[in-house]
């Protein structure tokens, strides 16, 4: 799945495009986001503006699912 496909899937599910970031760690850790480090997909999740959880996932799909669940639980 490409970055554009992930963005499209999240937006179609009702998640605002400015609610998450997919890309570099420096940007992803400052918002709800997914970044790649080595072979790991890392999910950064913020609650009330504070970094509250970091999840290490084995696959892109797992990372997308985790971030999606976190964002949708907040809404």
Q: Which residues are covered by each model-predicted region?
A:
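Short aromatic-glycine-(Arg/Gly/Cys) micro-motifs in beta-strand/loop hairpins
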Residues: 25-52, 70
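Negatively charged, low-complexity tracts enriched in Asp/Glu with abundant Ser/Thr
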Residues: 1-26
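A general marker of short, structured functional hotspots
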Residues: 6, 16-17, 40-41, 51, ...
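Generic structural signal for short, solvent-exposed loop/turn connectors between secondary structure elements
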Residues: 1, 74-75
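A short, charged, amphipathic alpha-helix used as a generic interaction element across diverse proteins
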Residues: 56-74
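Short, exposed beta-strand "edge-strand" segments with a Pro/Gly-rich flavor and a Y/T-containing core
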Residues: 1, 52-58
């Amino acid at each position: 799945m490409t970055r554009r496909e992930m963005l499209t899937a999240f937006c179609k599910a009702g998640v605002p495009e400015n609610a998450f970031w997919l890309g570099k760690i420096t940007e992803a850790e400052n918002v709800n986001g997914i970044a790649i480090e080595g072979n790991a997909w890392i999910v950064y999740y913020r609650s009330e503006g504070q970094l509250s959880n970091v999840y290490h996932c084995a696959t892109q799909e797992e990372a997308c699912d985790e971030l999606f669940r976190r964002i949708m639980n907040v809404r």
